């Protein structure tokens, strides 16, 4: 008999999360798994009182993670359809799922249950030969400086204007990056023209650095994004870390900049829709 309960103490899932990341075939997106997942609802799967698995559901009804330990008596192929068919009163309505191609079991479960999906984002990681900086020699260097607490408001205003993100969320997000010395700025005449993020992982995937950048609207198309990413990649490499990042599938400009900076994409993040599930016998 399997019971499903909501989990409020995420540290209870530490061992299961470690196993989940160990099964991935490539580093998982930092913003999704360390930004969005902690803000979402977690549900534990219990057999005879023992925690044997979990899933994560965001506020919009989309699964972000799904895991069942191989030691569990329950078959994951039976549990997943039960949940996505909205048969769990604890979890409630599940509209769909976000899953990357680097999560083979979770991806297979989604594909088995619906044919309705679209590409949401492209996942990139540093080309192996890029460590020698063979590409970097052809990219104009850029002077970037670490953001300070005094610059927080200026950076928040810039990002809010450039990408339309909520200021309240940006304030908390950037404040944390500044404290960790992971937020950089490219500033001319006291105006922020670009920001760069080089985020380290506290647990799981600690050999990688997750990059992010924003370029001012009026500065786009001039090669600035490539220079920022190249700076961040070199900074990551100087600390013995491999660079990775992601971008929306519709952002062609960012994809070109990322490729020029020496990163390539083999995996995608897919968005599945469970409103049309496959017929099951």
Regions found by a protein language model. Give the residues of each.
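Conserved hydrophobic beta-strand within the GNAT/NAT acetyltransferase core sheet
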Residues: 97-99, 211-213, 243-247
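…primarily DNA-binding HTH/wHTH and HhH modules…
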Residues: 255, 260-281
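Acyl-donor-binding surface of acyltransferase catalytic domains
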Residues: 58-62, 68-140, 272-273
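Conserved acetyl-CoA-binding loop-helix of GNAT-fold acetyltransferases
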Residues: 73-86, 215, 221-236, 255-260
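Glycine/small-residue-rich hydrophobic helix-like segments
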Residues: 182-237
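Active-site rim helix/loop that mediates acceptor-substrate recognition in acyltransferases
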Residues: 21-42, 164-187
């Amino acid at each position: 008999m399997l019971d499903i309960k909501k989990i409020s103490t995420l540290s209870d899932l530490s061992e299961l999360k470690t196993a989940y990341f160990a099964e991935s075939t490539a580093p998982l997106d930092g913003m999704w798994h360390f930004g969005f997942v902690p803000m979402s609802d977690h549900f534990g799967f219990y057999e005879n009182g023992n925690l044997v698995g979990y899933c994560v559901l965001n506020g919009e009804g989309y699964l972000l993670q799904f895991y069942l330990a191989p030691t569990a008596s329950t078959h994951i192929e039976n549990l997943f359809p039960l949940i996505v068919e909205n048969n769990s009163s604890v979890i409630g309505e599940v509209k769909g799922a976000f899953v990357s191609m680097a999560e083979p079991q979770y991806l297979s479960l989604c594909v088995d249950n619906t044919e309705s999906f679209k590409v949401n984002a492209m996942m990139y990681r540093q080309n192996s030969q890029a460590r020698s900086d063979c590409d970097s020699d052809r990219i104009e260097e850029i002077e970037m400086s670490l953001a300070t607490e005094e610059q927080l408001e200026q950076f928040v205003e810039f990002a809010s204007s450039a990408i339309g993100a909520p200021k309240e969320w940006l304030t908390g997000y950037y404040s944390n990056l500044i404290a960790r010395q992971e937020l950089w700025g490219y500033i001319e005449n006291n105006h922020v023209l670009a920001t760069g993020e080089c985020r380290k992982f506290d647990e799981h995937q600690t050999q990688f650095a997750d990059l992010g950048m924003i370029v001012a609207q009026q500065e786009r198309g001039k090669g600035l994004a490539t220079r920022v990413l190249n700076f961040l990649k070199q900074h990551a490499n100087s600390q013995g870390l491999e660079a990775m990042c992601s971008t929306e599938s519709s952002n062609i400009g960012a994809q070109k900049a990322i490729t020029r900076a020496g990163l390539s994409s083999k995996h995608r993040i897919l968005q599945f829709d469970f409103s049309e599930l496959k017929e099951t016998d």
